[in-house]
From Swiss-Prot:
Entry GO MF terms: ribosomal large subunit binding; translation initiation factor activity
InterPro entries documented for this protein: eIF6
Protein name per UniProt: Eukaryotic translation initiation factor 6
Functional summary from the UniProt entry: Binds to the 60S ribosomal subunit and prevents its association with the 40S ribosomal subunit to form the 80S initiation complex in the cytoplasm. Behaves as a stimulatory translation initiation factor downstream insulin/growth factors. Is also involved in ribosome biogenesis. Associates with pre-60S subunits in the nucleus and is involved in its nuclear export. Cytoplasmic release of TIF6 from 60S subunits and nuclear relocalization is promoted by a RACK1 (RACK1)-dependent protein kinase C activity.
Gene that encodes it: EIF6
Secretion signal span: none
PTM notes: Phosphorylation at Ser-174 and Ser-175 by CSNK1D/CK1 promotes nuclear export.
SMART domains: eIF6
PANTHER family named among the record's database cross-references: TRANSLATION INITIATION FACTOR 6
Source organism (scientific name): Bos taurus (Bovine)
Assembly with partners or alone: Monomer. Associates with the 60S ribosomal subunit. Interacts with RACK1. Interacts with DICER1, AGO2, TARBP2, MOV10 and RPL7A; they form a large RNA-induced silencing complex (RISC).
Phosphothreonine carried by residues: T165
GO BP: assembly of large subunit precursor of preribosome; cytosolic ribosome assembly; maturation of 5.8S rRNA; maturation of LSU-rRNA; miRNA-mediated gene silencing by inhibition of translation; miRNA-mediated post-transcriptional gene silencing; positive regulation of translation; regulation of fatty acid biosynthetic process
Keyword Cell inner membrane: no
Length: 245
C-alpha cells in the first residue's frame, strides 16, 4: 500500500524518515501528524522510532540501512546512537562511519541484498557497508548522477530510478540489483525520488504532492498490492489454521 504524507508542509518526506523491513526512523518534529501516519501503517509489525542524527532532522539523508543494520555518520552523538540502539531490534547492527561524504543517504542506497554507492566512496566505508548490512556493493551512477542515494529507490521487490535513466542503464542496474526497475517521478514531477518517498517490501510513503498516476506506478513497481508484512501474514495463517482445526 502507498500512502501520502508531509512533514510540516514539506513533501520531501524521504529526507525526514528512513524505512526498512525491520524498523522505521522518523525525524523529531513540532507536529505528531507525520509520526502518526507511519505509526498507523506500521504499528505492530516494526518499531517506529523518533530520532535525530548529528543534531539534524534530515535523518533520511544522513544514514543508510536495511533489515540487517544501520550506518550513521561519525558526528552522530553518543546520546542519539544509544537512543536508536535501545529502540531497534537486537538483530540490527548499528555502526558509526568515518566518511568524507557524510550524508550517507545521498551517496548510498540499498535493499537487503545489494547496495549502490557513489563512485568516490571510501574503500573502508564500502567494506563496512558489506559487513554490517550484509550486501554486495556496486559503484554506480544513475542517469549520470553520482548521488545514487538521491535518484534511485529500491526494495527487494522493485525499484524507481531517475526519469532520464536510459533503457540500457535501467537494464544494467536491474541485472545488478536483480529487481525490476521503472524510470519515474514523485511529488508531481520531482526527479529526486529518494527525497520524495520511502519504501519497504509491503508499504510506501510518498510526498503529499505525489499524483495518483505516480502513486499507482509506485504501487505497481514495488508490488505493494500483493505484499503483506510477514508477521501479519503469519498471524493470519495461524488464526486460519486454528479456525479450521
Amino acid at each position: 500500500m502507498a500512502v501520502r504524507a508531509s512533514f510540516e508542509n514539506n513533501c520531501e518526506i524521504g529526507c525526514f524518515a528512513k524505512l526498512t523491513n525491520s524498523y522505521c526512523l522518523v525525524a523529531i518534529g513540532g507536529s505528531e501528524n507525520f509520526y502518526s501516519v507511519f505509526e498507523g501503517e506500521l504499528a505492530g509489525t516494526i518499531p517506529v522510532v523518533h530520532a535525530s542524527i548529528a543534531g539534524c532532522r534530515i535523518i533520511g539523508r544522513m544514514c543508510v540501512g536495511n533489515r540487517h543494520g544501520l550506518l550513521v555518520p561519525n558526528n552522530t552523538t553518543d546520546q542519539e546512537l544509544q537512543h536508536i540502539r535501545n529502540c531497534l531490534p537486537d538483530s540490527v547492527q548499528i555502526r558509526r562511519v568515518e566518511e568524507r561524504l557524510s550524508a550517507l543517504g545521498n551517496v548510498t542506497t540499498c535493499n537487503d541484498y545489494v547496495a549502490l554507492v557513489h563512485p568516490d566512496l571510501d574503500r573502508e566505508t564500502e567494506e563496512i557497508l558489506a559487513d554490517v548490512l550484509k550486501v554486495e556493493v556496486f559503484r554506480q551512477t544513475v542517469a549520470d548522477q553520482v548521488l545514487v542515494g538521491s535518484y534511485c529507490v529500491f526494495s527487494n521487490q522493485g525499484g524507481l530510478v531517475h526519469p532520464k535513466t536510459s533503457i540500457e542503464d535501467q537494464d544494467e542496474l536491474s541485472s545488478l540489483l536483480q529487481v525490476p526497475l521503472v524510470a519515474g517521478t514523485v511529488n508531481r514531477g520531482s526527479e529526486v525520488i529518494a527525497a520524495g518517498m520511502v519504501v519497504n517490501d509491503w508499504c510506501a510513503f510518498c510526498g503529499l504532492d505525489t499524483t495518483s498516476t505516480e502513486l499507482s506506478v509506485v504501487e505497481s513497481v514495488f508490488k505493494l498490492n500483493e505484499a503483506q508484512p510477514s508477521t501479519i501474514a503469519t498471524s493470519m495463517r495461524d488464526s486460519l489454521i486454528d479456525s479450521l482445526t
